[in-house]
Amino acid sequence: MVMEKPSPLLVGREFVRQYYTLLNQAPDMLHRFYGKNSSYAHGGLDSNGKPADAVYGQKEIHRKVMSQNFTNCHTKIRHVDAHATLNDGVVVQVMGLLSNNNQALRRFMQTFVLAPEGSVANKFYVHNDIFRYQDEVFGGFVTEPQEESEEEVEEPEERQQTPEVVPDDSGTFYDQTVSNDLEEHLEEPVVEPEPEPEPEPEPEPVSDIQEDKPEAALEEAAPDDVQKSTSPAPADVAPAQEDLRTFSWASVTSKNLPPSGAVPVTGTPPHVVKVPASQPRPESKPDSQIPPQRPQRDQRVREQRINIPPQRGPRPIREAGEPGDVEPRRMVRHPDSHQLFIGNLPHEVDKSELKDFFQNFGNVVELRINSGGKLPNFGFVVFDDSEPVQKVLSNRPIMFRGAVRLNVEEKKTRAAREGDRRDNRLRGPGGPRGGPSGGMRGPPRGGMVQKPGFGVGRGITTPRQ
């Protein structure tokens, strides 16, 4: 059977997940990702106010990491890019936010070059590492509240398979599927204009991996090729948290630490990443979808992030040539049955011209044109009675200037508009939302697709089938 070589994106995402988890749990072990020829440049200024120079070699990198005083370090990954580079290496670029010692989150960018270790196929170590804070480069301190890092759980669109620690005589093994999801965020640049958007598969999903104890909140998008799924499904947060309670990096690293707890630096082999070659995978078709449920905390945070302009009621429209009055005018509310929605208006249309046109059907008491920049424009016509409204509707199609067909509809009531939105949300792209719980979790355990595993100490492998 022909074995597939793991994609750079799969290698990069799994490396990112484990790197920032170790940064949170055991920063004194971080140097094991590097080798004797590795370089490490971390954001910061030297005594002269210039960007600090890079350090080289595992020993110097360990000193540099310890000088950063990483304590309770939380990371929110917004985006990950990974591409193949020279000599079968992988270059990984990470963008996100980092909080050290419970301080405010700061935006950062970090670039890794993963090079083949050489002794075994699909085994990597960090050859180059460059880290910069955005505020040190562009100025200005861009922050987000720290509580979001500890409490917020983004809504992933694929259920995440829980990690598992598998002991073996040859060392400690760690196996985890990369979560598939779709924000956005997000954040990918995650723009969510509506509190309840319809789920749509997107190429770069973003999720938060939030563990039960204060650990790195890792948001990352999984590659689309990990699982073929036609529609996204939100993660079941509670079971994932219950399973994660059994996992601790302390149990992983304690087997490789000396009794005193000190980390030997001299002569320590580089922490390498072994990525087993994946086998051809069978296509899996999801039989059911997980009912989407948005946590109230997540909903509240999303609404706070969106800058919602204050809603304004309809303003009375002045007649053409009417002098502007300085006194505030009283707003008059008209019944919906007296109003018409007018779409497909020419961009150069004049209010007086449009009003004269509709005066042929009845007395126009108010006319509004919305020209928000998107063509064609639209507006509303208000009559003094419901009879002209029905007269216009019965004479459709309405031709303006003899050539422009206007889209004329009766204005819907607020209850009708909310009912339409509710129906659209319940309908969704694949029928009514909901259905049996416990949908597809991704590739079945023991299946054909293997995820890269990472660990510390004597190298990295994955559990045997």
UniProtKB/Swiss-Prot annotation:
Residues 338-413 form the RRM domain. It holds the Pfam family RRM_1. Its cofactor is Mg(2+). The modification Phosphoserine is found at S149, S231, S248, S251, S371. It comes from the Eukaryota. The modification Dimethylated arginine is found at R458. Residues 248-257 have a biased composition (Polar residues). Residues 428-445 have a biased composition (Gly residues). Phosphorylation of the acidic disordered region regulates stress granule assembly. RASA1-dependent phosphorylation of Ser-149 induces a conformational change that prevents self-association. Dephosphorylation after HRAS activation is required for stress granule assembly. Ser-149 phosphorylation induces partial nuclear localization. Ubiquitinated by TRIM21 via 'Lys-63'-linked polyubiquitination in the NTF2 domain in response to heat shock, leading to stress granule disassembly: ubiquitination promotes interaction with the FAF2 adapter, followed by interaction with VCP, which extracts G3BP1 from stress granules, leading to stress granule disassembly. In case of prolonged stress, ubiquitination by TRIM21 leads to autophagy-dependent degradation of G3BP1 via recruitment of ubiquitinated G3BP1 by SQSTM1 and/or CALCOCO2 to autophagosomes. Residues 408-464 are annotated as: RG-rich region. The modification N6-acetyllysine is found at K374. GO terms for biological process: defense response to virus; innate immune response; negative regulation of canonical Wnt signaling pathway; positive regulation of type I interferon production; stress granule assembly. There is a cross-link at K374 (Glycyl lysine isopeptide (Lys-Gly) (interchain with G-Cter in SUMO2)). Under physiological conditions, G3BP1 adopts a compact state that is stabilized by intramolecular interactions between the RG-rich and the acidic regions that inhibit phase separation. Upon stress, polysomes disassemble and mRNAs are released in an unfolded protein-free state. Mg(2+) is required for helicase activity. Keywords: Acetylation, ATP-binding, Cytoplasm, DNA-binding, Endonuclease, Helicase, Hydrolase, Immunity, Innate immunity, Isopeptide bond, Methylation, Nuclease, Nucleotide-binding, Nucleus, Phosphoprotein, RNA-binding, Transport, Ubl conjugation. Residues 11-133 form the NTF2 domain. Ubiquitous. It is an enzyme of class 3 (hydrolase). Its EC number is 3.6.4.12, 3.6.4.13. It catalyses: ATP + H2O = ADP + phosphate + H(+). The keyword Magnesium does not apply. This is Ras GTPase-activating protein-binding protein 1. It comes from Mus musculus (Mouse).
